[in-house]
Amino acid sequence: MTEKISKCGVVAVLGAPNAGKSTLVNQLVGQKVAITSAKAQTTRARMLGIALHESDDAKTQMILVDTPGIFAPRRRLDRAMVSAAWEGAESADAVLLLVDPVKQRRHELEPLLESLKDRPERKILVLNKVDVAKKEPLLALAQDLSQKVDFAEIYFVSALTGDGVPEMKNALAALMPEGVWHYPEDQVSDASERLLATEITREQLYQQLHEELPYDSAVRPEQYKQRPDGSLEIHQQIVIARESQRPIVLGKGGSRIKAIGEAARKDLSEILGVTVHLFLHVKVDEKWAENKEVFEEIGLDWVR
């Protein structure tokens, strides 16, 4: 029996905020490795999802770089997020531009298209939400964007339902170069369990508080230790910028933070495969977004 070729390559997933990048990465990997939210700019740092593909002649490992959404930066944190996004595209074997044709305004894509058009990487256009978008406007948008950037391929998918994703995954695997795998077969992300735990809690903050809580919040790790019975004890700090936000996070009688903790604990237990004891508390720090330690904790470079 002929031994299968080993292939390994990098795919950067770019797009405007809230285009569905993290949802698509989770679909390609086959499980949650990136947090998702209806709130834009949920992803803050580059995170790698690791997807596997096997064909008749090859076994392929695709390293998916889930990047922060690219937008006009205003704060130091914004600048670091946009910088991380473009760094994620460097040296990639393919760059996916994911576009939400339902919510995305055409003019919002212009700076991204302008920056992308002269880049040397193989560029692929992915139009999301085919499950809800109308066909004719979708095709017209694809043609319009292709006139701006020389896309090698165009795919129509639904990151939410998975429609069109297997076909795109097959095509991406075919593009990857021959080479040894960079990660063990059972590894699905480069994120440490400690970072993943803070990301899962942050996802619940966004999902449960919706528009009530602005972006000036973070989740910081405090303790992460294994108990004698094999379970994990995790302590985290929810950092907010103003005292007036504390009751929003806590809820009446502590009901909101309890619900956030319960949902995050359940997700973590399922992902890590062990019982998790999660303890959350709230801290007010008006200048947390200027704290170098916070940047390091969430995997962002400190930028001026």
From Swiss-Prot:
Instruction: Note down the stretches annotated as region G3.
Output: 66-69
Q: Where is this region: G4?
A: 128-131
The UniProt record lists the Era-type G domain at 7-178
Q: Which GO terms describe its cellular component?
A: cytosol; plasma membrane
Q: Which InterPro entries match?
A: G_ERA_dom, GTP-bd, GTPase_Era-like, KH_dom-like_a/b, KH_dom_type_2, KH_sf_prok-type, P-loop_NTPase, Small_GTP-bd
Residues folding into a coiled coil are none
Q: What is this protein called?
A: GTPase Era
Assembly mode? Monomer.
- So what family is this one in? Belongs to the TRAFAC class TrmE-Era-EngA-EngB-Septin-like GTPase superfamily. Era GTPase family.
Instruction: Spell out the residue ranges making up region: G1.
Output: 15-22
Cite the binding residues for GTP.
15-22, 66-70, 128-131
What segment(s) does the record annotate as region G2? Answer: 41-45
Q: From the UniProt record, which GO molecular function terms apply?
A: GTP binding; GTPase activity; ribosomal small subunit binding; small ribosomal subunit rRNA binding
* GO terms (BP aspect): ribosomal small subunit assembly
Organism phylogeny: Bacteria, Pseudomonadati, Pseudomonadota, Alphaproteobacteria, Sphingomonadales
